[in-house]
Amino acid sequence: MNLDNIINILFKHMELNNLVDDSDVDNIIKQFPESVYYGEMYRCMNVVGDIQVTDIWQSWSSSKESACLVCDGLRSGIQKGSKRVVLKQNSIGIDLIKLLRLIKQMDISEEQKKKVCRLLRSYRYEKEILARINYTYEIVE
C-alpha cells in the first residue's frame, strides 16, 4: 500500500466517519508498527428498551469520558426514559496522530505534506484511533 493510498483512507475515515476495512488497518500497521494502539475503546449510547436511539455510526473513543461527552451532545430530543449504556472493548488499531507525525517526518511531496497537515489539524483535539471493531464488548454502565 503506497502513501497516497494511506492518506486517502485517512481522509475517507475523517470525512465519512466510516469504518475502514480490517485489511487496510493491517496493512498500515505493517508499514508503521510504531503507530499501533492497543487498549480499551468505549462507546456510549442512549437506549430505550432494546432500541438504540443515538446515532448508530457514533465512533468508538479511547476514553469513557470522551465517549459520554459525544453521547451527551446527542441527548437533546431523546425520548424520556432512555438510559445510557457504555460499551467497552479491547482493540487493536492505529493512533492516527502518531501515524501522521511519522508520515510527516518522511521524505514526502509538498502536496502530501499539505494533506497530512490538514489531517493533523482535524485530529488535534482528542486521541483519535482507527480501530478494528470486532464487536466483542462488555457493558460497563
Which residues make up each language-model segment?
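Conserved NAD+-utilizing ADP-ribose enzyme module
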Residues: M1-M41, V48-E141
